[in-house]
Regions:
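P-loop NTPase catalytic nucleotide-binding module
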Residues: 1-19, 37-38, 105-233
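P-loop NTPase switch module centered on the Walker A-proximal segment
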Residues: 1-104, 110, 153, 186, ...
Length: 234
């Protein structure tokens, strides 16, 4: 099926080794209906680790391109190796991507490889998102992880999604004004922080928000939100 360029997204998954980039790729491919079940690193059945050597040692050495479709959008995912020896190989994919997704292991927090990848994405003027993986691991303090992210990359790093208090699901903080109790903070607080930051890049929206006191609809936030993502705040 042919796609227009407006309907294609190119996202590279970057970050330290053992952050879970390859298994995240498996989960996304499975959710997108591209594979019948998620592969296993131990069994050597992941899509990304396709060479014999990668299957033997249990970690990525090469970049791997996969794809899925979601609501009319064709998404190209580029899984990259995380060991520092392969930094050059991993960062080489950024020119082909619009967005760099920096994957962080919740048990480790912000590691040096995540900092280097964030810096590289910033220098190449890429949109950046941070994905906190392995949030269900034993002993994880998500609030501490979140504070560590803001300390490393700036207060403009805000949660778009938060896990529910019982960890059973993910709670959207962008489209919802309030909702389920979350693991820390609250949906309302997170939503307000996002809106406060988004309206800073749109004067007309700022006027509505401040002077008229109107509650902004998600549709009003969509384009300014994309603009805010592209602002080099950090």
């Amino acid at each position: 099926m042919p796609y227009s360029t407006a309907d294609i997204r190119n996202v590279c998954l970057v970050g330290p080794s053992h952050a879970g980039k390859t298994l995240l790729t498996e989960a996304l491919l499975h959710a997108g209906g591209k594979i019948p079940e998620k592969g296993s690193i131990e069994k050597g059945t992941t899509v990304s680790d396709f060479t014999t050597r990668e299957k033997e040692i249990g970690h990525s050495q090469y970049n791997s391109v996969c794809h899925l479709d979601h609501e009319g959008i064709h998404v190209n995912l580029i899984d990259t190796p995380g060991y520092r020896d392969f930094f050059g190989r991993a960062v080489s994919v950024m020119p082909a991507a619009e967005t760099a997704a920096i994957v962080i292991n919740a048990t480790e927090g912000v590691e040096e490889m995540a900092r280097r990848m964030m810096r590289a994405a910033h220098d190449q003027r890429k949109c950046r998102m941070i994905i906190v993986n392995q949030i269900d691991a034993e002993g994880v303090d998500l609030e501490k992880v979140f504070n560590g992210i803001q300390d490393a990359f700036g207060k403009e790093c805000l949660p778009m999604n938060l896990p529910s208090a019982d960890g059973s699901k993910v709670v959207d903080c962008f489209f919802q004004l309030e909702g389920d109790e979350t693991a820390f903070s609250s949906v309302g607080e997170a939503h307000t922080q996002i809106v406060d930051q988004v309206v800073e890049v749109d004067e007309a929206l700022m006027e509505i928000y401040l002077e008229q006191g109107e509650e902004l609809e998600p549709e009003q936030l969509h384009d300014p939100f994309e603009k805010a993502l592209r602002c080099l705040l950090y």
